Amino acid sequence: MPKIDITELTQNEVLNLSGHDRGLAARARFNLAHLDEDGEPVEISFPEGFRQVSSSFFQGMFADSVRSLGSVQGFFAHYRFDAPAHIRSKLADYAEQVLGRRDY
């Protein structure tokens, strides 16, 4: 199973990820377009004590993946997040937003 360690982005210096452009850069860095097409699940791990992923960062890094995989369930079956519960909950909300299934 391919693995993405978010510490590669944070360098253990920050506990938040924000910004659409940073999300796009992370998408390119980890070659998510290729991983989206690969049938093998991908584990994404967050550092201990991580606090927040902004919706703009999620949009940049994962919006194309959510659309490509066709559903929130498909996205989370393919990308498996090893993250605190509050982060996983936010990511689920953001994925729903990508597909326009929530009113905000």
Spell out what each predicted region is.
Residues I87-D103:
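Primarily interfacial, aromatic-capped hydrophobic alpha-helices that serve as membrane anchors
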Residues P2-I6:
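Extended, compositionally biased accessory segments flanking or bridging domains
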